[in-house]
């Protein structure tokens, strides 16, 4: 997408509070923090539905691509719509990883790794705090 949704930190905080987002959601989505493993509300959620960006409601993942990676964060094998997620090189913490962000608003979602199941071989390792689940 060519133009991302832009807001001030105060506007993002207000929007997330309005949505009833977890307190850590602002730090995760706007400052690339990571929630602690095995603490996110969607790690063990296997209901059918769609996972959206907590900040802008963009559809990111379908529950059919969710799997248990045993890593402590919700994991998906593919994005719902090509282009919904942007990838950037992340060299923080002495590692080189691929960061994932919402293409619509730039919210930090998590990271993608090349160790997932077939057919994609990818593991989108997401923070629950960056997601909002809409059941089918």
Curated annotation (Swiss-Prot):
Active site per database record: 125
Designated name of the protein: Peptide methionine sulfoxide reductase MsrB
Cofactor(s) needed: Zn(2+)
InterPro entries: Met_Sox_Rdtase_MsrB, Met_Sox_Rdtase_MsrB_dom, Mss4-like_sf
GO BP of this protein: protein repair; response to oxidative stress
HAMAP family in UniProt: MsrB (MF_01400)
Gene expressing this chain: msrB
Metal-binding is among the record's keywords: yes
Entry note: cofactor: Binds 1 zinc ion per subunit. The zinc ion is important for the structural integrity of the protein.
Similarity field: Belongs to the MsrB Met sulfoxide reductase family.
Positions of Zn(2+) binding: 53, 56, 102, 105
Catalytic activity: L-methionyl-[protein] + [thioredoxin]-disulfide + H2O = L-methionyl-(R)-S-oxide-[protein] + [thioredoxin]-dithiol
Keyword Calcium: no
One Pfam family matching this protein: SelR
